[in-house]
């Protein structure tokens, strides 16, 4: 995941 996104 990225800084502003959940780890999906």
Curated annotation (Swiss-Prot):
Keyword Secreted found: yes
Tissue: Found in the abdominal ganglia and perisympathetic organs. Sometimes detected in the subesophageal ganglion and thoracic ganglia. Not detected in the corpora cardiaca, corpora allata, hypocerebral ganglion or frontal ganglion.
Residue numbers bearing the Valine amide modification: 8
Coiled coil, from the record: none
InterPro entries membership: Periviscerokinin
Chief site of localization: secreted
Subcellular location: Secreted
GO cellular component, one term: extracellular region
Protein keywords: Amidation, Neuropeptide, Secreted
Keyword NAD: no
Gene Ontology terms: biological process: neuropeptide signaling pathway
Function text: Mediates visceral muscle contractile activity (myotropic activity).
Protein family according to the UniProt entry: Belongs to the periviscerokinin family.
The protein's name: Periviscerokinin-2
Species this protein is from: Schistocerca gregaria (Desert locust)
